[in-house]
Structure formats: C-alpha cells, structure tokens
A protein has these predicted regions:
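Glycine-rich phosphate-binding P-loop
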Residues: 155-175
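Post-Walker A helix-loop "phosphate-sensing" segment adjacent to the P-loop in P-loop NTPases
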Residues: 175-185
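ASCE P-loop NTPase motor cores of helicases and related translocases
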Residues: 124-150, 164, 183, 204-205, ...
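Residue-level preference for the first positions of well-ordered beta-strands
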Residues: 153-157, 183-185, 264-266
C-alpha cells in the first residue's frame, strides 16, 4: 500500500498534471452586492527600464520582489513555468504591483523577461517544490480513494509561524488539485490577512479554477464571517466559535456535492502558534476534522502536535522556501491597508466605489464582545467568557470615523447575528452629528442590501 511517507520520499511527480479544470467557480452563498475583484492595492505605471532576461534550467525558479511604489512585468518567452501552481501563458505579460513577492518555477526549463523596478531578482535551484508536489501526490491518492468509496476527501491544515509561506503552500496545493479536475474547498482562518474578505474576517470558497497569476483566486462570492480584530488573541472565544461555524457550513456543502466532498478541504491558519494560539490550532483541527497537518519550518510545533493529536491525524514537517521574506509590523500594517484598498479600487484602479450618506435611524450598528467583568458582577449562570460573544448595540458617534463596517446578511436583530455571514464591507469616511448621518465608502451604490452593521477594530484612511 502506498503511504504518505513513501510518496513524500519519492522522486518528483510533476507528470501528474495532465488535466485542466475550466468550470465556473461555485457561488457559496448568493451575493447581493457587486463587490468586484479582491485584487492588489493599486496599479502604478510601468517604469521605463531595460528588461532583464533569465534562462532557467530544469527544477529552478526566478524570485523577485517589486520595489515600493513601483511595478514590474514578467513574460515567458520560451519553455513552461508556473507561479504557485498556476501555469504561465507563453508570450503574455503579467503585471505586479508595489511590494509583490513572486516566484516563477519551471519543471523543464524556460526563458523569462523581467521589466520594471525590483529590489532583488535572482534564480535559485534550492527549492522545496519536489517535496510540495509529492505532498500533493499523496493527497491526490487520498482523493482518488475517497472518490471510489464515495467518502470524504483529505482535509489539510497548514500551520506554522509567521512568514514561512503558509498561504503560498495553500494556494499551490489548491491549484494542483484543480488542475487534476478537483473542486477543493479553500478555507482561510488567518484573520490578520483575510484572504477571503478583509482583514478581521474568516471565510471559505469552493475553487474550480486555478488562481489568476495577477489577482489570485477570483473571490466572486466567498462565504465570509465577521470577526473584527487583527489577531485571534483579541477575542479567543469568538474566534473559536466562528471557526466551528465555518467548519459546520463546509460540512453541509460537502454533503451536497460528491465532487466537493472527495476533493477535500485546505485550511490556511494564522502564525500564532504559542499558548492560546496553539490551543486555537488544536481546536481548528478538531472543528474541521482534519486528517493531515502540514507543519512548515517548525520542528517544535511538529512534535507538539504529534504528541497531542490522535494517531489517525497524519502530521508532516515540510521545509519553507528560501524565497520567503520576513515582514515587519509596519509592512504588515501596510499589507492590511492594501488589502482593504484593493477591495474598493481593484488591482489597476479599475473599480469605482461609491460614497453616500447613511442616516443614523436607517441602520443598526453592533460590536461583538463586551468588556469583561468580574464573575461576581455577572448575572446568575453567566460566565465571563460569554461577554466575548455578546452583541453590543452602539450609538453612532465620531468614534466610528475610519472604521471598517461589515454588512451582515441577517435581516432582523432576532437572527443569530454573530454566526451569520456578511455580504460585504463599508468604511466610514465622515460622521455628521448635527445632521445625524455618516458617510460611507461602498463598493456599490445605495441602498445598502441589509441594515445591520458590525464594527471592526480595524481602520482605513481613504487617501489615494
């Protein structure tokens, strides 16, 4: 019998990628707003610079980082190559914006032309791609077995500290699965990045097309839940509740489709792996009922999980790519701002958000989580942890200025608003207490699809 260990130690299995998926992305929930493409922050005009040509040998990759407030362009002239599992088209130019970190890998060799301002650009033959593709091959065998037996496919939790390439590995494994005709669920519970919505959210998407080279997965209608903070530690109780809720809905979706069920689930996690963060990882593993955990570049975490989780959960230690770059707190903050900006304005400033006033009386605004009180001050039978998931009504005030608001799909306050998905996001750009209105930046024109709004701790200054 072929095992995960034997696959991981086998030679490269790149010849597995023979079929391609060209189906329409499944819409997880009906969306009432056209929120556009979640792309990169903004597009800058290509600098007039001489292009560089790189000739890549077999099993090597070109790595480059785009300078701040600059842009770069890549074109494949000869051969074949891929970016995080998505194949590049020959003689097509791909644009990358400020701060982009790109790796183009080739199994058989290629020639690439790079134009623009980059902080660094070099070719490396030291990559973990063989290990990654063999991991995919092992997962694919599990999917094939699940398809034959009409059972559930593999559920993979990708864990590790910050800046080890967890999101990239999830994207790569998802793309490889899609290229073999699978339809995996990609879930993101890293609230610091918010790949499915905005920072401060978690979400999931059924993927049936490979990620776009420039824009990533086209999140036309992901399932997204409001969390409201940048770290799971800010409201541990709420975070675990939402992760469990997301897992429950994914289970329902898998029950509705044999293809999705056998394709499995790939889950990206936050880089918080100590203390309560480690407990959150274990709870996520239980909520999603994972059978494989990929630990990136953290032997301590690998051994902890081996000791604490059941034997049926296969835990593998994978190396990180040498191209992974550590980010400072300032860079992380810039990345969050860019993520919000791209939501409203698009990759190439090709989206045009709307600005309009909202009357105080037309909406109901809430914050999830009340200040903690001593047990002695709480009502009989209530625990202090319960306050973390309590819905607190807010009176509109100047303190709303620049805060991100989630538009809840709940139609009335009688709904379980905390565990209801959101339809989209707004930013408060002005508050007029005299007129009892506040101004919002919105992806679509008025009226709002629903009137229940949830406040985030996350703020955004709309300065272009």
């Amino acid at each position: 019998m072929v095992t995960l260990d034997s696959i991981l130690s086998a030679p490269s299995l790149s010849n597995l990628f023979l079929r391609f998926c060209q189906e329409i992305i499944f819409v997880c929930w009906p969306r009432n707003l056209d929120f556009g493409i979640l792309a990169s922050s903004f597009c800058l005009k290509m600098a007039e610079e001489e292009s560089q040509e790189f000739k890549l040998k077999v099993n090597s990759e070109l790595r480059f980082e785009v300078e701040h407030k600059a842009s770069a362009e890549i074109e494949m002239i000869e051969g074949s190559g891929e970016m995080f599992g998505t194949e590049l088209a020959k003689n097509k130019k791909y644009a990358f914006v400020s701060g982009s970190k790109v790796a183009i890998y080739t199994w058989h060799g290629c020639v690439l032309k790079l134009k623009g301002k980059t902080e660094v650009a070099y070719v490396s033959t030291e990559t973990p791609m063989t290990v990654y593709v063999n991991t995919h091959a092992a997962l694919e065998q599990m999917r094939s077995k699940a398809e034959e037996d009409s059972t559930r496919g593999p559920r993979i939790l990708v864990v590790g500290p910050t800046d080890v390439g967890k999101s990239t590995l999830c994207r790569l494994l998802t793309n490889y699965a899609v290229r073999l005709g699978r339809s995996p669920v990609l879930a993101d519970i890293d609230v610091g990045q918010g790949n499915m919505g905005l920072p401060g959210t978690i979400g999931a998407l059924v993927v049936e097309r490979t990620a776009d080279i420039e824009e990533g997965f086209l999140n036309t209608a992901p399932l997204v839940f409001h969390y409201g903070h940048k770290s799971p530690n800010d409201n541990f109780q709420l975070y675990n509740m939402l992760v469990l809720r997301l897992a429950e809905i994914i289970n329902v979706r898998c029950e509705q489709s044999k293809k999705v069920n056998s394709s499995g689930v790939i889950i990206n996690t936050a880089g918080w792996i100590r203390g309560a963060g480690y407990e959150a990882l274990k709870q996520a593993a239980g909520a999603f009922e994972v059978d494989v955990i990929c630990v990136l570049d953290q032997e301590r975490l690998y051994n902890q999980l081996k000791g604490d989780l059941p034997d049926f959960v296969k835990i593998v230690l994978l190396p990180k790519s040498g191209g992974v770059v550590e980010r400072s707190q300032a860079i992380r903050a810039d990345s969050r701002d860019s993520r919000i900006r791209e939501y409203f304005y698009g990759l190439k400033n090709n989206l045009f958000p709307h600005t309009f006033d909202v009357k105080f009386n037309d909406v109901k605004i809430f914050k999830i989580g009340a200040p903690s009180l001593p047990e002695s001050c709480l009502p009989l039978g209530m625990k202090s942890q319960d306050s973390q998931t309590k819905l607190v009504p807010l009176v509109p005030a100047m303190s709303l200025l620049h805060h991100v608001l989630s538009v809840s799909a709940a139609t009335t306050v009688d709904h379980d608003i905390v565990e209801t998905n959101v339809l989209g996001f707004l930013v408060v750009t002005n508050v007029d207490m005299d007129k009892s209105v506040f101004t919002v930046l919105s992806p679509s024109p008025r009226p709002l699809p629903q009137t229940i709004l949830l406040v985030m701790d996350i703020q955004f200054m709309d300065i272009k």
